[in-house]
Amino acid sequence: MLWQAYVDDHLMCDIEGHEGHRLTAAAIVGHDGSVWAQSATFPQFKPEEMNGVMTDFNEPGHLAPTGLHLGGTKYMVIQGEAGAVIRGKKGSGGITIKKTGQALVFGIYEEPVTPGQCNMVVERLGDYLLEQGL
């Protein structure tokens, strides 16, 4: 399977109805922290940062006191869906992470992309992967 095509064509694409608006960075990462595919702009993350994300999916609320860290950037964790979606905010941008059976789908955005648009793009691909048993 060509995971890079999913990142390029389904995550880093123009937002529907908003030509030129797209995520800042995106990736698909295995539960073990291995990168399956990523945009050129996706931050280099530390293993402990990915461990924190996985722990929060298994123990919702784990990241709330400390924030979500990715590539040295700290995001304030905002409402998500326990065990399924983590959302974070930093200034005028943020992050959405959708958990599938085998992977995590990451989307990072800055204005003019809205949190809702990022959620839609990331969760749509995540839901598709779940339907495919991935």
UniProtKB/Swiss-Prot annotation:
PANTHER family: PROFILIN, PROFILIN-5. One of its GO terms (molecular function) is actin monomer binding. Its main location: cytoplasm. The modification Phosphothreonine is found at residue 114. A motif (Involved in PIP2 interaction) lies at residues 84-100. This is Profilin-2. The variability of the residues taking part of IgE-binding epitopes might be responsible of the difference in cross-reactivity among olive pollen cultivars, and between distantly related pollen species, leading to a variable range of allergy reactions among atopic patients. It holds the Pfam family Profilin. InterPro entries: PFN, PFN_euk, PFN_sf. Gene3D superfamilies: Dynein light chain 2a, cytoplasmic. It comes from the Eukaryota. Belongs to the profilin family. Keywords: Actin-binding, Allergen, Cytoplasm, Cytoskeleton, Disulfide bond, Phosphoprotein. Disulfide bonds join 13-118. SMART domains: PROF (SM00392). The keyword Cytoplasm applies. Occurs in many kinds of cells as a complex with monomeric actin in a 1:1 ratio. Phosphorylated by MAP kinases. One of its GO terms (cellular component) is cytoskeleton. It is found in: Cytoplasm, Cytoskeleton. Binds to actin and affects the structure of the cytoskeleton. At high concentrations, profilin prevents the polymerization of actin, whereas it enhances it at low concentrations.
